[in-house]
Structures are given as C-alpha cells and as structure tokens.
Design a protein with these regions (language model features):
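Lipid interaction determinants
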Residues: 17-78, 83-136
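C-terminal motif of bacterial Sec signal peptides marking the signal peptidase cleavage site
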Residues: 12-15
C-alpha cells in the first residue's frame, strides 16, 4: 500500500512539474511572438556593433520561424527555446552579416516582457558575445 502511495505521489509530482514547464513555455511564447523586436545592443569580440543591426526588426512566430526585415531585405530563419536551460537558439541559414552573428545558442541573462539580454560563447573565436533585444 505504501509503495502504491509513493508511486502515486511521484507520478503526481512529475505531472505537476511538466504542467508548470508547459505553462512557462506558453508564457514565454506569448511574450516573444507578440510584437516586433530590435537589437538594442550587440557586443562582439569586445566591440560594439549594434549599429550593424540598425533598421532591422524581428518577428518571432509560434511555428518557430523568425523574420528579419531591414530596408529592402527580408530573411527568414528558425528559432527555438529551452526553458530549463534558459537558452534561445537562432539560425538564419545562409544569411550574411549582420544576421549571421545571431546564429548561436544564447543563454538568457535577464528578461522582461519588453526586453531580453543574452550572451553566448562564439564557437569560432572563443569569445563571449552579448545581445540585447527590445520590443518596439
């Protein structure tokens, strides 16, 4: 009887944990996919290259696509998140600079409903890059 009770409690706890994670996932998706975002800060190899992203706006969709529009340029990429690891991955396949600089797995360092700060270790140059996105 005790084993059955313990097994039931473990199952209940795991179910609740999955439910909470799903709710967190849904909340994140609602914030990210609602509105347009822009690069408010980007530091690469200790150099501020934020101005390279001037004029670009990003639209994240629930189907994990992201569209970057700047001037006459529109590029579609993919994005994904991992709530447990606090990471977001972006991939603009075949994109040129500056969008190619976003093709990383970013660790979220700070987040609000209208801004996100993140960092990543550049796997090519072995440096830490910093990104700040703000909602328009």
């Amino acid at each position: 009887m005790n084993r059955l009770l313990i097994a039931g409690l473990v199952l209940l706890f795991c179910s609740c944990k999955k439910y909470i994670q799903k709710q967190e996932q849904n909340a994140l998706e609602a914030v990210v996919t609602n509105g347009l975002w822009y690069v408010a800060g980007y530091e690469q190899n200790d150099s501020d290259i934020t101005s390279s992203f001037s004029g670009y706006l990003f639209k994240f969709d629930a189907n994990n696509t992201v569209t970057a529009t700047g001037g006459n340029t529109t590029v579609t990429g993919q994005w994904s998140d991992n709530i447990n690891a606090r990471t977001v991955t972006a991939d603009f396949a075949g994109a040129a600079a500056p969008l190619v600089y976003l093709n990383e797995t970013w660790t979220i360092t700070d987040s609000y409903t209208d801004s996100v700060s993140a960092k990543c270790v550049d796997t090519v140059n072995h440096t830490t890059n910093f990104l700040q996105l703000k909602k328009q």
